[in-house]
Amino acid sequence: MKIFNTLSRRKEEFVPIEEGKVRMYVCGPTVYNLIHIGNARPMIFFDTVRRYFEYRGYKVNYVSNFTDVDDKIINKAIEEGVDAAVISQRYIDECKKDMAAMNVLPATKNPLATQEIGGMEDMIGELIGSGHAYVAKDGTVYFRVKSFKDYGKLSHKNIDELQSGFREIKVTGEDGKEDSNDFVLWKPKKDGEPFWDSPWSKGRPGWHIECSVMSKKYLGDQIDIHGGGEDLIFPHHENEIAQSESASGKSFANYWMHNAFLNIDNKKMSKSAGNFFTVRDISEKYDLQVLRFFMLSAHYRSPLNFSADLMEAAKNSLERILTGVDNIKSVIQRDNKAPISDAELSNLEIAKVLKDKFVAAMDDDFNTADAISAIFELIKLSNTSLNENSTTEYANGLLKVIEPLCDVLGIITERKTEILDSEIEDLIEQRTQARKNKDFALADKIRNDLLEKGIVLEDTREGVKWKRS
């Protein structure tokens, strides 16, 4: 299995630290609002990486944090007049709902930054003691970048050419920096902000130290894979390396993986441009299985363009797979116990070759696009070979190949019964048109079909209202 390592900028053979086990850390969201579709890409991709390792027999310890203390969380809490913890817990809960709808498996651990403050203070203290960090007069603690000779090795930046562009919250006393590239490990509190006592000041940790500490606590000083979006390479992941390796004296992560950006209609997603979509927005029109399938339709290191046309294409492609699986299951239900034929045995050998093609694609830096192509070939083989005389043994053989591969990609092959809001509205419109055309039989059928799916219609003077029973 080969993985493209951002650190070396080349594909490398995966060799785990501990045989048969994988330690993975993936940076999670800052929970101040509903997650957007840009957040969804790393969630879906690294969940797929985790699933594939498990498919290959590895035991995966998968840790992904929630950043639950941040300026954006604090500002929202002030706007609403509530504690910051109320905001963060609200959106952690909503994030978990969206992740479940995208069939993202629960992480082994989802640590919260605010629950790991003690560990952060310990690591900061160690860094100060070893000369890698220093305390400014106002109680801000900075990491001394020049003390870490390998700084810049992940982003391939020359430290002498770096400009101070770190994502850190400006604080009074920043003049206390020894060097413009030094970054914050601990910042003194401002009025109205949550804070914790520390040996240096009442305040809170910097963003970068949070992940170093949570990774160390739950995975150890050295991990196999660290992942995230490519926007995190610098400064966040660069700073994590500096902190973790300065504290432990060991190499932090053996493989660094980063997914590329998601654009909307070939433009950067932004609220001001009016092209900003939350996962919840997408769920109003599509089953989130479609979003997941769309995200995996391109290689993770390739920029991905989101558009209505491409989502429709993903919906249709996913439907081809699900219909193919339905077809196999219908043959199984016919329960033809006749002996499997030579032709069917030959087709099962072809299916095994296609399974190997799927594995080869995933072994090549998790090429999900090519892996999906292998599944389509399996579906084509199934569709063209199954007929009224097909044996149950043959159909079961096909299903045993296809379903585990779908599961690796997080494709749920069992049909969902819940109907989407947009589908309900479409059916109500069809029913309204049928009534105008005096086709009352069709109108009644639509009403009854919706009722069977738990949707109750009410005809009012203002129009048709509906609710889920």
Where are the regions that the model predicts?
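Short Gly/Ser/Thr- and Asp/Glu-enriched loop/turn motifs at secondary-structure junctions
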Residues: 106, 136-138, 459-463
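Structural preference for alpha-helix termini/caps and helix-kink/transition segments
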Residues: 268, 275-469
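Short catalytic-loop micro-motif centered on adjacent basic/acidic residues
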Residues: 62-63, 108-111, 226-228
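Short phosphate-binding/catalytic loops that engage adenosine nucleotides
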Residues: 58, 132, 455
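Alpha-helical recognition segments enriched in aromatics with Gly/Pro capping
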Residues: 1-32, 47, 118-329
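Short, glycine/charge-rich beta-strand/loop segments that flank catalytic centers
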Residues: 66-70, 92-95, 105-120, 138-148
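N-terminal, positively charged nucleic-acid-binding surface of large information/translation enzymes
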Residues: 8-13, 17-105, 462-466
